[in-house]
Amino acid sequence: MPKSLSVVLTATLLLIATSTQAGLHSHAPWVASVTTATERSVSLWSELAAIEFPAVAPEEVWVRIDLKRRELALFQGEQRILTIPYLAFGTAGANRIRLQGSSQTPIGDFRIDRINRQSRFRLFFGIDYPTPEIAHEAWQSGILSDEDYHDYRSYRRRNGHPPAHTPLGGHIGIHGLGNRPANLHQIRDWTEGCIAVTNTEIQMLERWLDVGMLVVIR
């Protein structure tokens, strides 16, 4: 092969290689999008792995309320059955020890202890806040006086559910909207501490929720 032709072929191959590399670089956004999708997938699995599942039987149905995500999820064991993507809670946020009149939603593990099917909020599933653990914590920290704590324990022992007249308040639960606008809970938090979903959603939950069911609020 003549030397001049060899030089031309070499230059051509170098040009093709350079063009190919440039072409790959021009597709960088596509590569980035694949990476982003992968990162999103990893993030999703990380979030699922981060869920702290309570000690429940595989067939036990329970409720998990994620205030940060504003989501109510129904689980059977560790399997998610359904998710309600929007909810409203207390106008003043949330706290483990929720005080009477604070408009905060309590955080913790609770049990449904009553159902009101004549509620002005369409349906009301009450939870056992304040629990004995929270009441004891409040007493130790000075929020409840000795007399308040004695009243709490006596009332719960007599009635099987916590009182609502101590400084910790009560009457907390999951309910619908009643006669309020259907999209209210998507606009702002408006409750005095309860968890609110739409009337349609609370009626859908009725087939699952029952007295004794675990409700985890985080």
Residue map of PLM features:
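N-terminal pre-domains immediately preceding structured catalytic cores
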Residues: 2-218
